[in-house]
Amino acid sequence: MNVGIVARKGNDEAVATALDVYEAARDHGETVWVDEETASSLASEAGSPTVPGRPVAALAACDLAVAIGGDGTFLFVARNAGDTPVLGINLGEVGFLNAVPPASATAAVRSALDGLADGDLSVREAPRLVARTDEWESVPAANEIVVHGDRRGPGSGIEYELAVDDSQYSTGRADGVLVATPTGSTAYNLSERGPLVAPDVDGLVVNEMAARTGM
């Protein structure tokens, strides 16, 4: 199997954990690589083995992606991984998405590889959002899509109309409108006083940002 590892930039603990995970997956018999910046960091350390580095875009062709850092690192990996399952090693303060502590990283990777080999890997599928117009389309977003005006505050904002399945649901004026996945309910949505939603809920959050009128 092909395993790609991405570590948080500029973090010595992330680089060290990446090396541990690399060696665990390699000893498991897999083809393993790390992101180019982590490979460069390892190459500069005396006594470190030569570890192959690849662009993060190569994650989409992997059987397993490993994100080492905080939620930002996890989301960065998810944007590049396509349908590849992502295992998160948490080095951040919160870690809503990265569930595995560094001390359990190698054991978690070996368990995931065993699950993939046996065809019984337990995964949680997370929805992603795409914004689309006649002229462009966004990359898939794991957290949220936000529509807003040029600036926020008094005298600014947008008039909006919200439709669901081509039927008008609401109109109003606000600084903007945010649509979040359950995963994203813990991010920007929460700072805009939106609700927390359990990851397994089949739905989306629609949140007015500093609304002038209620939905």
Predicted features and spans:
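N-terminal glycine-rich "phosphate-gripper" loop used for MgATP/nucleotide binding
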Residues: D63-D71, A78-N80
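Gly/Ser/Thr-rich active-site loops/lids in small-molecule metabolic enzymes
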Residues: G155-G157, S170-G214
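Short glycine-rich anion-binding loops that position phosphate/pyrophosphate groups of nucleotides
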Residues: G10, D71-T73, G92, T183-S185
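Catalytic core of DAGKc-family lipid kinases
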Residues: G92-D175
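Short hydrophobic core segments
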Residues: A65, I145-V146, G176-T181
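Short glycine/serine/threonine-rich phosphate/pyrophosphate-binding segments
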Residues: A14-V15, G72-V77, T171, T186-L190
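ATP/NTP phosphate-donor binding region
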Residues: M1-L64, S104-L121, T133-S138
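Gly/Ser-rich helix-loop-strand patches that form or flank binding pockets
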Residues: A81-I89
